[in-house]
Amino acid sequence: KLKFGTSVIALPLRNPTVLAKELATIDFLSEGRCLPAVGLGTEDEAEYEACGTSKRVRVSRTEEAVEVIRLLWSQDDVSYQGKHFTLSGVTVQPKPVQNSLPPIWFGGRSEPALKRTAKLGDGWLVSQAPPEEVANSIPKIKEMALQYDNHIENDHYGAIFSYCFADTPREAEQMAEPYNLRRRRDVPMRNMNAFGPPEVLSNLLDKYIEAGATKFALRPACPPEMTYKQMEMLGNHIIPRYHKS
């Protein structure tokens, strides 16, 4: 089944009580198909200041927020005293419908991010990482997760990347350029995004699957008025190959 996800939320910028309510509501409405992922956010200090916090505390704030969210999902009348958040008798309704609570996946590809995933995460959803990097990182997470006594399911590893369909890769790359996220310059964009005919996307998906990824968040990189058409092509040419009845 398709999941209802969030890409990767910049958790230090969010109020965990409000976010717990929002995600639980999505899980309730989707009958248990909410798949949230969280991360530390960008390196831009202005984003943290705009949300009333500081980049300096983003790690501890993220770890504390995850703890608060899981408490609110699993209990009523939650009281909590932390460095960043304080709750007194707070209850969130509706509760998530997933029996074991929605899995919280972590983003990030740095060594500290992999360690954080292994320690606190239920899965890993990475962006801006080519398949070979994913293949190298998954065993690291699994090994560290054992050290933290944290069980991560084998199918809880995924990737986010952009796609744009066109007759040729060159045409697709030109169309996608203004809309594609580019946060690293050391890897060619075509190695971690899919621009061109549908087979370019299916070939990249196959490489990620071979690397150990099983869940994917695909971002159409195109003019807004073309988004529906791009998603329609995804449904017609790609989804049937991987979701056979």
Language-model segment annotations:
Residues 1-245:
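Active-site-adjacent structural elements that line small-molecule/cofactor binding pockets in enzymes
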